Amino acid sequence: MKVFIDKAVHEEIVSFYEAAMNHHITLDEATVLKKVDRLYDAMESLGTYAEIYPIARLKSNWISKGYQEFICEDFHFAYRIYVLENGEKIVRVHDAVHSLLYH
């Protein structure tokens, strides 16, 4: 399946790591880039593994929207599988939150 990532997810990842680098002087740009690469690799792998992850449990709006959830690098991602008119399945990642920021 093809994977599509909402702009809000990109923004959440960038803002978290920008803040982390400002607050933790030992966190360097090379380390952050490796973590971000792992996040995007994991999201791309949803094209293969999306159907095995459970229904979201972290946020109430994720639950009400019927999203599924997976976790990578302490980020929780909410996504849904859609079937297009031609029968093709796609994955759309709708939202993300880091474990440290969720209240």
Task: Tell me the role of every PLM-derived stretch.
Residues 1-67:
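Basic, Lys/Arg-enriched alpha-helical interface segments
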Residues 65-103:
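Enriched for short, Lys/Arg-rich terminal
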